[in-house]
A protein has these predicted regions:
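The feature captures the beta-strand-to-loop junction immediately N-terminal to the Walker
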Residues: 37-39
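Helix-to-loop junction immediately C-terminal to a conserved catalytic motif
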Residues: 52
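Conserved ABC transporter NBD signature motif
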Residues: 60-68, 77
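Conserved ABC ATPase "signature" region
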Residues: 101, 116-134
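Conserved ABC ATPase signature
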Residues: 112, 138-142, 146
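Catalytic Walker B motif of ABC-type/P-loop ATPase nucleotide-binding domains
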Residues: 163-167
Length: 260
């Protein structure tokens, strides 16, 4: 069996006295494309932050390549795992090319400058994400979908084995949602990159992810393929609405039943 890339065992976490995650255990493997799904407040973003070493669990353990996350050098971890938050506030005016190049920072020593190789890797990341055409534009001048592609390019410039994304298609129109997810699917397929992302659209999750983890009230309800997870009775219980299931091009389709 393939070695787990990241392994979480019995993870619990609370914000002050509010429990958010309760006894979470899961593992990721090479080329997993995992969609974390579930209602608002189910713990998706918090789980991603624990996987990205942004938050420390109150109990349980996280291992990356069989080494405890608490003992791994942060710089080395940043070379292997990249994190893309939902929001990208930029106070200072940076050009797109500068933001992508920031992805090389985990490889730089203090007071050193980017090498020719760093610039080449950043350029390839922009080509892969179709952001080269606005490399010289300022980040705050481009659209939401373009900003998301730039952040993926910066994360890709880290040359990671795993990418963690918090709702990468939030607030984007359908065209940009498909564009972003297609780029991620390409990274997963061609670069063999492991992807874990929080998302709300169950139909897009079914179309692009090879594995879904359904969370509710801080616990894993179901973990498996889209066909194993997107079950009528389970979805109705978790989301509290009636749904119908169908299929299109081999993917499960979830349709809310709207009373008229």
């Amino acid at each position: 069996m393939t070695q787990a890339l990241m392994k979480l065992e019995n993870i619990s976490f609370a914000y002050e006295t509010l429990p958010v995650l309760k006894d979470i255990s899961l593992s990721t493997r090479e080329q997993d494309f995992i969609g974390l799904i579930g209602p608002n407040g189910s713990g998706k973003s918090t789980l991603l932050k624990i996987m990205g070493a942004i938050l420390k669990p109150d109990s349980g353990s996280v291992q990356f390549k069989e080494s405890s996350l608490s003992k791994i050098n942060k710089k080395l971890f940043a070379q292997s795992v990249s994190w893309i938050p939902q929001d990208h506030p930029m106070v200072f005016p940076f050009k797109v090319s500068e933001i992508v190049l920031m992805g090389r920072h985990p490889y730089l020593s203090p007071l050193s400058f980017e090498s020719e190789e760093d610039f080449e890797i950043s350029q390839r990341a922009m080509e892969t994400t179709m952001t080269s055409q606005f490399a010289d534009r300022y980040f705050n001048e481009i659209s939401g979908g373009e900003k998301q592609r730039v952040m993926i390019a910066s994360a890709l410039a880290q040359d990671p084995e795993m990418m963690l994304l918090d709702e990468p298609t939030a607030a984007l129109d359908l065209k940009y949602q498909i564009q972003i997810l297609s780029i991620l699917k390409n990274l997963n397929a061609r670069h063999k990159m492991t992807l874990v992302m929080a998302m709300h659209d169950l139909n897009l999750a079914s179309s692009f992810c090879n594995r879904l983890i359904l969370l509710d009230e801080g616990q894993i309800v179901r973990d498996g393929t889209p066909e194993q997870v997107l079950k009528k009775d389970i979805l109705e219980q978790v989301y509290g609405i009636e749904v119908d299931l169908g299929s299109h091009d081999g993917s499960i389709r979830v349709h809310p039943v709207i009373s008229r």
